[in-house]
From Swiss-Prot:
Keywords: Developmental protein, Glycoprotein, Immunity, Melanin biosynthesis, Protease inhibitor, Secreted, Serine protease inhibitor, Signal. Residues 1-16 form the signal peptide. It comes from Drosophila melanogaster (Fruit fly). The record marks S499, G500 as: Reactive bond. Serine protease inhibitor which is required for pupal viability and plays an essential role in regulating the melanization reaction. Inhibits spontaneous melanization and appears to be involved in the melanization immune response to physical wounding in larvae and adults. Acts by negatively regulating the Hayan-phenoloxidase (PPO1) cascade in the hemolymph and possibly the trachea. May function by controlling the initial release of the activated form of PPO1, phenoloxidase (PO) and thus maintains PO availability for processes such as wound response and pigmentation. One of its GO terms (molecular function) is serine-type endopeptidase inhibitor activity. This is Serine protease inhibitor 28Dc. The gene is Spn28Dc. Induction: Up-regulated by injury in larvae and adults. Gene3D superfamilies: Alpha-1-antitrypsin, domain 1 (2.30.39.10), Antithrombin, subunit I, domain 2 (3.30.497.10). Disruption phenotype: RNAi-mediated knockdown is often lethal at the pupal stage, with flies displaying small black or brown spots prior to death. A small percentage of adults survive when grown at 23 degrees Celsius to preclude pupal lethality. These adult escapers (then kept at 29 degrees Celsius) do not display melanotic areas until several hours after eclosion. These melanotic regions or spots are predominately in air-exposed parts of the body, such as those close to the cuticle, and the thoracic and abdominal spiracles. In the tracheae melanization occurs only in the trunk closest to the spiracle.
Amino acid sequence: MWRLLLALLLVSSVCCESELFRDDLRTPETMAYINGLMQRRHQMQQEAQQHIQAIPPAVPLQSPGLVNGLGNQNDPALNRISGTSVKPSNLPAAYSNGYVDLATSDRIANSVLNFANILGQHLANGKTQIYSPLSIVHSLALLLLGAKGRSYEELSTVFDIPDTSRLHEQFGLMLQDLQQPTREAISAGRPLTDWRASSAMRSNRRAQRPGAHEVHLANGLFTQTGYTLNPDYRRVIVEVYASDLQIQDFEGSPATARYNINAYVAQHTKNHIENIIASDIPQTTRMILANALYFKAFWETDFIESATRPDNFYPNGEGTEPVMRVQMMATGGAYPYHEDHELGCKIIGLPYRGNLSTMYIIQPFKSSVRELMALQKRLTADKIESMISRMYRRAALVAFPKMHLTESVNLKTVMQRMGLGGIFSAVQNDLSLIATNEATRTNALGGNSLQNLEAQRRAGTGGARSDLVVDDIVHKVDFTVNEQGTEAAASSVTYLKKSGPDVLFRGDTPFMVLVRHDPTKLVLFYGLINEPPAAA
């Protein structure tokens, strides 16, 4: 039986440049910091009265590298298969004008967030967990593209979007927009999140710093020598999903193939993940799909480096035993915030520079490991989006644990529990649209490759059922939240508590974290922080 291994690699370096404060400092600089905070509080109260703006109408795409929504013959992404150019197909009429379909985009984003929430419930063990739902769902989309029969039916439940051609087109466009370094480079027609719309000028003041916001997504599809892909499948994963295709000799030189794949991953995660494939590759392997996501961003409002100090964290609720000692960071400023008394939780956003992404932190009012797990079961993508839509900036003081989290998990078992077990079964699996006995033919149906794949799926013209079976889905994450930068003076957490901000948010009890790309609403990282790393 031929094997297909999905290796998903994520690295997130969430950084912030810093100003400094300590508990025992009450200098003139501290007082100046407090006065500035209170002035910003008044400013944010005024902004809150006009934070909802009209959503701009959809306009034609201006994104480079896409012509008619699918591809430009000069696009480097089309020259990744042994130097051979793949000509773009013509899109269906519905896409020929190149518009962002916000309805479909929002459904895709909701699907990613719902998947994250369901996966989190299946992984729940009372410990800290962190993963990238976007990376996992992205790989499932590539499997959906080549699936038929029961495999297609199971994978379709992740998205619940009947028009799969539109799904892939819009998802590919969202992933392209996700990687743009500035708001201006993103496809026109994606509105600002409401709370960002009220304060875009402020959040853009420091957005032009080079490297302030970096997202890089890479797909490497490594196939056995002589194993030929369906030309329609190959064309779509290159043109729509910008995948890199490489040929490896898993049978004759598995050690070399392993080295090359690990090197590819290390390159695209800037050496944060260097050994994704730790063991020998089985010689029966015919394909390995490696998905690497690299994210690095600086906070819009700097954390205060010298304020970082050991502090208590209470997994079972504030004031209870056991008590963990963690490195707690602190800062103050104007942050988007909302309290939902029906759900019994609060949400605060820590924006990154560039007006693009935000770390949203959701915490029960009286949080504990048990309360957070109960909240997770109550939450849905729609409820989370509703809370985000009702946020507005308020003067706040924030204490948040410094974290470096690593996670490695094989997802086969949990996927089977989620009802996605067919792709792992030699009997039930059908990925015959990826590669078939007829795959050497050249686009025999002609026209658009997405439409061709859909026609093959419906009519059964994709050839004999494939022996390709997913062996496992390996998911690795390296996630860092820290502070770094220049030294300056500010005040202490204790003293600032007395200055009367609107909000005091302390991450000293369990919380949920979402790193979200606001223009596309895609969740890059999702986690439950029940036990942050202990203070050194």
